[in-house]
């Protein structure tokens, strides 16, 4: 058994132990994941269901979603994300997602086959992937703890999502410091590698630098006025 397979087996056993009411060993699963599992369970997330409760259909019409997405501040960074990341992963089995501050998926781009597969778990534009809605996952956890995170296979709370791995990091407004959304990479085993999280962090850093550069002249003008 490879090291990766051994780790996955250990995590899966811890997950099953946790769901059955047990207390997995501290070294069986990362504390950030264990805490997220606990919040997911307490919040009533069904571990057997990966569908985000029909939220995209119940709260926004297609026209409302299109208008909301177009006006959302994270949409302004989409061209930079495309040039830094999306173009490079076109046929790699990976997708890149941009969410809003609530975990709603605003844009999903990348490998078309991977997008089709992701649709089976409702990882589609318009659906909500917050921790409260779908349980432990990288976009939702990044929003919950306001830091970059990687969630690998059986670390996901919803069983149907456990064939996927994801890495995500929050994007902050340069003026307020508030989180405006998340940049996420989702795929298979390749996203379980450390470089996936490093790549997301690098892209978010570039996005926040560019946003800060655009804000600086407005700050100086405000001071002069």
Q: What does each model-found stretch correspond to?
A:
Residues 161-170:
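A short beta-strand signature within small-molecule sensing/ligand-binding domains used
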Residues 1-130, 141, 150, 163, ...:
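Intrinsically disordered, low-complexity terminal regulatory regions
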Residues 101, 145, 153-155, 169, ...:
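Fold-independent oxyanion-binding glycine-rich loops
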Residues 131-136, 142-157:
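Short loop/turn segments at beta-alpha junctions that line or gate ligand-sensing/allosteric surfaces
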Residues 85-86, 139-140, 155, 169-172:
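A generic local secondary-structure boundary/capping motif
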């Amino acid at each position: 058994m490879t090291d990766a397979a051994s780790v996955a087996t250990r995590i899966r056993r811890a997950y099953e132990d946790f769901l059955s009411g047990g207390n997995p060993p501290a070294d069986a699963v990362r504390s950030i994941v264990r805490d997220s599992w606990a919040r997911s369970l307490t919040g009533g997330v069904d571990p057997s269901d990966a569908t985000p409760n029909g939220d995209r259909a119940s709260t926004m019409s297609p026209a409302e979603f299109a208008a909301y997405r177009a006006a959302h501040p994270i949409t302004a960074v989409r061209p930079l994300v495309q040039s830094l990341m999306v173009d490079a992963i076109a046929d790699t089995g990976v997708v890149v997602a941009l969410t809003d501050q609530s975990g709603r998926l605003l844009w999903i781009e990348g490998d078309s086959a991977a997008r089709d597969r992701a649709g089976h778990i409702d990882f589609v534009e318009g659906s909500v992937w917050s921790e409260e809605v779908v349980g432990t996952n990288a976009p939702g956890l990044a929003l919950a703890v306001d830091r970059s995170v990687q969630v690998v296979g059986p670390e996901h709370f919803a069983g149907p999502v456990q064939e996927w791995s994801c890495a995500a990091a929050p994007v902050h407004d340069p003026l307020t410091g508030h989180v405006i959304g998340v940049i996420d990479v989702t795929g298979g085993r390749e996203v379980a590698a450390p470089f996936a999280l490093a790549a997301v962090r690098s892209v978010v850093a570039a996005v926040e630098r560019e946003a800060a550069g655009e804000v600086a002249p407005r700050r100086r003008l405000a001071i002069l006025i």
